[in-house]
Amino acid sequence: MKKPKLSKVEKIDKIDLFSSLWKQRSVRVIMAIGFLYLVIVSVEIPLVFKSWSSSSVPLDALSRLEKLNNEQEPQVEIIPNPPLEPVSYPVSNPTIVTRTDLVQNKVREHHRGVLSSLRFDSETFDPSSKDGSVELHKSAKEAWQLGRKLWKELESGRLEKLVEKPEKNKPDSCPHSVSLTGSEFMNRENKLMELPCGLTLGSHITLVGRPRKAHPKEGDWSKLVSQFVIELQGLKTVEGEDPPRILHFNPRLKGDWSKKPVIEQNSCYRMQWGPAQRCEGWKSRDDEETVDSHVKCEKWIRDDDNYSEGSRARWWLNRLIGRRKRVKVEWPFPFVEEKLFVLTLSAGLEGYHINVDGKHVTSFPYRTGFTLEDATGLTVNGDIDVHSVFVASLPTSHPSFAPQRHLELSKRWQAPVVPDGPVEIFIGILSAGNHFSERMAVRKSWMQHVLITSAKVVARFFVALHGRKEVNVELKKEAEYFGDIVLVPYMDSYDLVVLKTVAICEHGALAFSAKYIMKCDDDTFVKLGAVINEVKKVPEGRSLYIGNMNYYHKPLRGGKWAVTYEEWPEEDYPPYANGPGYVLSSDIARFIVDKFERHKLRLFKMEDVSVGMWVEHFKNTTNPVDYRHSLRFCQFGCVENYYTAHYQSPRQMICLWDKLLRQNKPECCNMR
């Protein structure tokens, strides 16, 4: 049924009604609110769905997360902690808290500077008869005075003008060959022949010598010895230290513990020997790696071999009558007392090869960390008379040995900007002024870890001033460019390394409010993720001391590293972690700095023992300490699944980092 149509008058009445309602203000407000509500709802609904969909984690992301958690070195996300309060100190000693806060504010203002803000004054090194460190305090005071004077010269710029290098563009001559007579060589200091530009592929050394007759060892006629050592040394690799032994060749004519003639070969870097290669008269196994297709060890006739004059006669007879059967020739030990020999050492593609009297004796593969151009010195020592030395096929171009030239001035290696606020771990790296290549290797290896590049962990080199002015000028430039060096203003000395450790504690605990302080050396490779995981094992808030611990060690009273009773009157050392790598909690670091600046910190020349002593004092007077021991903080060299690896050359540092990136597991670079 159709609805009746409205008349024209009725339509006009409805329009008038709507118009009158619209003119009412309340109706207009209600309609505006309704329209706004519709707009908000239409916008919110897609966002809700999007948020819901993004909260659903896909399976592949979960699997990646699970894989990361199962890895030995997860990329730990470190959330910045609130400013650390010195809660570990007794409440009854409020002066420490107040003073620490003041010092912390002072240090934070200057922590981006080059110079350490550790406070030295005239009373810092006053000798104290209480702890037997009179001589150490005297030398520290002298070093501080010299360093302060030198730093003022550096700051003023006068030193840079005084240091001139007239021969900067004049390279050393690179002769194609070098030769010396026996008398010339034997009269040289340390029996050393310099090879100005090192060796190159194909270089060879020919030495004519005569082993001396065996003599009693230390006057004991039951122990006769006759041995000599030929070494290739890296004279320009380090300064002020024993040069690395790139090749150590040591024939022992009377043998050693085996009582059989033996040839031992090895390499040594910073007093750390690698795995020895011993040739004892047995030919290398067929499945053993060769060096340029040569075996590492050739066979020679031993005393227990069945090789008589009759067998030699039969061999010659068979040769004369034309027997087709091939008879293998065997030779005696290549060196005989009081008999001349001609030794040739040649540099191959994969290693060094040694021939004696025209016969191959042994080959030694190149070790990671050294190159041919590093071999700039030849030494011969021991029970031998040298008749002549001839070195040929030397490089004619001059390689760069200046350590500072190893610096790669690229912004890629500069320290990242550290935001305000505390960091999780501060790593202080002990370094010497002239260790330019060592610092560069650290920058290009483990300091590229994501935790350091993201500034969640901060690493800095701590360097004292060097005895050579030109080194200090270059060092200051390096510090200003890379922004990762803290100069401690005293003249560097091995006995005063402990001052750098105090500076590390001060810089880490006060300048960066770090929760933990780690100390290591510039030849230490740090597997950062593994160290962090080890720290996380200690309950939150506990004072900790982590490293390769030594218990009940006694001081050496004789020899090169002797410790006098005046220096250390006690019979035992306290428990201490080996110096190449250890971790302290920040409350211990603050304790050390406070004692030092109040002139109450006992100093000892052995840095790692000093830290153990300070930690024990903290434990006895302030808070319990959680000691954690692990052999993976390596004192000597590198071990499987290391946390830190020590005595690593710059090339080994790069090798360790490359292996860690490619294989995601710690693998040593002891070999080539």
Curated annotation (Swiss-Prot):
Optimum pH is 6.5. Disruption phenotype: Reduced levels of arabinogalactan proteins. Defects in root hair growth, root elongation, pollen tube growth, flowering time, leaf development, silique length and inflorescence growth. Increased sensitivity to salt stress. It holds the Pfam family Gal-bind_lectin. It is found in: Golgi apparatus membrane. Possesses hydroxyproline O-galactosyltransferase activity. Transfers galactose from UDP-galactose to hydroxyproline residues in the arabinogalactan proteins (AGPs). Is specific for AGPs containing non-contiguous peptidyl hydroxyproline residues. Utilizes UDP-galactose solely as sugar donor. The addition of galactose onto the peptidyl hydroxyproline residues in AGP core proteins represents the first committed step in arabinogalactan polysaccharide addition. AGP glycans play essential roles in both vegetative and reproductive plant growth. GO terms for cellular component: endosome; Golgi apparatus; Golgi membrane; trans-Golgi network. The keyword Transcription does not apply. Expressed in juvenile leaves, stems, cauline leaves and siliques. Glycans are attached at N306, N620. Gene3D superfamilies: 2.60.120.200, 3.90.550.50. Belongs to the glycosyltransferase 31 family. This is Hydroxyproline O-galactosyltransferase GALT5. It is a single-pass type II membrane protein. The chain crosses the membrane at residues 29-49. Its EC number is 2.4.1.-. Residues 191-392 form the Galectin domain. It is an enzyme of class 2 (transferase). The gene is GALT5. Its cofactor is Mn(2+). Induction: By salt stress. Residues 1-28 are cytoplasmic. One of its GO terms (molecular function) is carbohydrate binding.
